Amino acid sequence: MKLRVLWVGKTQEEWVRRGIDEYAGRVRRYAPLEIGEARDEKGAAAEAMRARECERLDKLVPRTSRLILLDERGDQLTSPEFAAYISRCRDTAVPELAFAIGGAYGFADEFRRRADRVIALSRMTFTHQMVRVVLLEQIYRAFTIIGNEPYHH
């Protein structure tokens, strides 16, 4: 099963880029991973920004992918529950999981309706930059849980 992690906007901070590189490398030991960036929209009303950013994200998601949005209002899963979800997808021959992290104003309703699942990493708010690293770490953690490896205590 292939994984795709998509987000809006360039990664600004060097330490975030290092974290992305570290965890993307770890994830790739378990599954093919593609990372994609959609250009962020500037200088428009929030609704217009959401719509344009989601149009760009949508072009990066193959129709055969199972789309999972990261949103603070999504389902909260424990790490073992997240691992079980990934494992079920893999075991039922889902060809690809595509995770999308929205821009500053979130997702347009139309893109949200396309999603197969919406999850939250926490009830707390994170920067969109930070979520990139946290999501990749949780995907890596999920694979170590699936493999019964000692990373997750």
Curated annotation (Swiss-Prot):
Its EC number is 2.1.1.177. Its main location: cytoplasm. GO terms for molecular function: rRNA (pseudouridine-N3-)-methyltransferase activity. The keyword rRNA processing applies. It is an enzyme of class 2 (transferase). Homodimer. Specifically methylates the pseudouridine at position 1915 (m3Psi1915) in 23S rRNA. This is Ribosomal RNA large subunit methyltransferase H. It comes from Geobacter sulfurreducens (strain ATCC 51573 / DSM 12127 / PCA).
